Amino acid sequence: MSWTVFAQQLTHYSQQPFNQVLINPAFAGNAACAEMKSVHRAQWVGLENAPKSTALAITGRLGKPAKDRLSVFHGFALKFENDRMGPFQHNRFHAGYAIHLPFKNEHFLSFGTYFGVDNINFDNSNLHPLQSDPSIQNSRYSFLAPDFVFGTKYNTKKLFFALAFQNFVPLDYPIGAQSKKVFHANFSSGAQFELGKSDWTFSPMINVRKALRTPIALDFYSIFTYRQDIYFGLGFRNQESLLIMARFKVFGRFKVGYSFDWVLNSLRGGMAHTHEISLSISACKERKKGATICPVFE
């Protein structure tokens, strides 16, 4: 018997459209003010040792405010993520920087990096395998490794394309015989359409994830937004689940979100569905009500 650390090595968030900075450092400083974003995800609820994930990011702009919309500006992000699954606990700490290069008509090309550390903890004291494995018997490990993420994005007021490369530093974990940290790529794209003369907008989005030696994972989203205050979305994760999400602005500077993943694969027999909640806090001043200004989903 051998262990591969985290068949799902990196968390995929159902509410990624609202929390891109958790994946891609090129989104650091995207908003014109400081923001805090947090997510808690309980995956496959009802299954023993099912994954649970928590993430927190603080992001903002560096330096003096841009003089105009054709000025280069810089962003920063500080991020912490914690994943727990059975005997494993995975902590990631990152500090990020992004540069945003403007073009005419409010087109931006951005590049960002995260530098940080991965901490993998393994404790099999509560693990009861069917067959004894000497490589993990009475094992407790704590492993620290450097981590690097690179991201880029291109956006206008109506669409965006973003690409992030994660687990850039390939390493072997000292847990079992086949425990490796593998390279991941994450691509997302979306657009925004105003629905007539109303205050509603419609934003389709796609997210594509690929890790070495694994099938491509696809998420499709359809998100409706009213006056930057109310968001409703439907999604589909290929061969895995249907997604339903809602997000509301409360008390001016807070946005609270919830998503539910209705599992379609073999886990459905155990009704092992997934719940995710999010909270974001923005220091931005209130803008004039109306359609959202960018499909990056601030």
Identify the meaning behind each predicted range.
Residues Q8-E298:
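Subset of outer-membrane beta-barrel
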